[in-house]
Amino acid sequence: MKSLALALLVGGAIASGPQQQVLREPVDDPQAAETPLQKISDIFGHLSEQAGNVWEDVMDKFPDTLMDAITQTPPPKKHNRRPDSQWDHIVRGSDVQAVWVEGDAGEKHRKVGGRLDTYDLRVKAVDPSNLGIDTVKQYSGYLDDNENDKHLFYWFFESRNDPKNDPVVLWLNGGPGCSSLTGLFLELGPSSITKQLKVKYNEFSWNSNASVIFLDQPVNVGYSYSSSSVSNTQAAGKDVYALLTLFFEQFPEYSQQDFHIAGESYAGHYIPVFASEIMSHSHRNINLKSILVGNGLTDPLSQYPHYRPMACGEGGYPAVLSSSSCQAMDNALPRCLAMIQACYNTESRWSCVPASIYCNNALIGPYQRSGMNPYDVRSKCEGGNLCYTQLDDISKYLNQDAVMESLGAEVSSYESCNMDINRNFLFQGDWMQPYMRVVPTLLTQMPVLIYAGDADFICNWLGNKAWTEALEYPGHDEFAAAEMKNLTSLNHEDMKVIGQVKSAGNFTFMRLFGGGHMVPMDQPEASLEFFNRWLGGEWSAKSP
């Protein structure tokens, strides 16, 4: 959930902030006399003349608050590590890494690839009766990267149906920097949280026919913590690979089932990269069969041109913005696309950060200032930067001592989104990176589903359809030419149409009617149906 959370703040800040002086009055202290551009150069390294010109231009509208955002270092999250005796299982990555096996041809190789010796996995068997979230078997705990003092929290729910045979799914929320426990309690998990902080059973939970792992990543998100940080998608992928490898080592009974990665929003960055990391290891215990990305940000160059149409009445819903605002967005688009293209060409922070700042201000800022919900064009923002008051209820629930004790949480407090992480990813240039470039290889290895609720603005269905049709890969022409067909529910006698779908080879795009940024929250029954049908192989959910 919540892709572009900081981007909205950046867009609004630039648009509403006063014009800043790039050069300040002379002072005696040379350090104090540095221009903002020089300070950024000190942080990022050498600045080329071309990049400097771009930054000078962008920083004409760069408020002091953003300079503070670049340079500030957040304090580590307060935590209290529990003794090993309080955990039911501890898997040592060094032990797993030391295991060698013999191949069919007699050659010896490590049982699983990748560097694991710095990692441990701690596991707590959660008593279902303590919290009442679900009656199924549950595990929670931490992946520890001892070398870098990183600790990722996870919560596993077994399938309600047939856990010995049902697939296993990893769920990831976005942000970057938002907890996947938001997905658990607001969208697709076994229960939601009421305003009275009581649990309410969800009959349309995605663990109806699959076991689901909810992971708080990267570090310092949700119950996760670290004295260090992760500020790019590729680094986060190493941690996720280690967690899954050690989890399936501890629980081999789940490692034989099909495994899928699903998520939304900034997970459009995460999931292709994480899947690529997994598949890069020829010897692995992760039986990855497909990926699913909902309302994701994956190819900004193809997606950003569709902010204006979605905000201005061309996405299936009434216009939110005035004609003058729409024209201003049109006017800004060519420069935005040129800056994104420069980011694609260099994959450098110097090019990618200005592209994020300029484009988010020009194309997202106008919508943010409208007061409408960027995650659902049908409603106003309810308050706060993330527009959903339910997030406060979830945070209050997860901050209760009894809940934290039941789960083995080690942090002093829980927050749904960590804006420090969001900022770090933005200013590392991760935002505009062309991560769709790894998708063509994935399509040779597994089916890929891109789905989108059609009422979302921030990662809208128009942009997601556009990038799937623009993707350069051998099956491009066949997919681009495929028709959008009605997606009809099989659960209703009246053959209710719940969306549209197009599919060719291993690539599928799906539009879900009446869903916002969080489809499982807005359309719980329809989301569970398409999820089950995807896992069942109706489209391409069988590996070639």
From Swiss-Prot:
PROSITE patterns per record: CARBOXYPEPT_SER_SER (PS00131)
Any one Gene Ontology molecular-function term assigned to this protein's record: serine-type carboxypeptidase activity
Cysteines joined through disulfide linkages: C178-C417, C312-C326, C336-C359, C343-C352, C381-C387
Stored PANTHER family: SERINE CARBOXYPEPTIDASE CTSA-4.1, SERINE PROTEASE FAMILY S10 SERINE CARBOXYPEPTIDASE
Stated name of the protein: Carboxypeptidase Y homolog A
Main location: other
Matching Gene3D superfamilies: 1.10.287.410, alpha/beta hydrolase (3.40.50.1820)
Organism: Ajellomyces capsulatus (strain G186AR / H82 / ATCC MYA-2454 / RMSCC 2432) (Darling's disease fungus)
Entry-linked Pfam families: Carbpep_Y_N, Peptidase_S10
UniProt keyword terms in alphabetical order: Carboxypeptidase, Disulfide bond, Glycoprotein, Hydrolase, Protease, Signal, Vacuole, Zymogen
Magnesium as UniProt keyword: no
Catalytic activity: Release of a C-terminal amino acid with broad specificity
Residues at the catalytic site: S265, D456, H517
This enzyme's EC code(s): 3.4.16.5
Subcellular location: Vacuole
GO terms (BP aspect): proteolysis
Functional description taken from the UniProt entry: Vacuolar carboxypeptidase involved in degradation of small peptides. Digests preferentially peptides containing an aliphatic or hydrophobic residue in P1' position, as well as methionine, leucine or phenylalanine in P1 position of ester substrate.
Assigned GO CC terms: fungal-type vacuole
Family: Belongs to the peptidase S10 family.
Top-rank lineage group of the source organism: Eukaryota
Residues glycosylated per entry: N209, N506
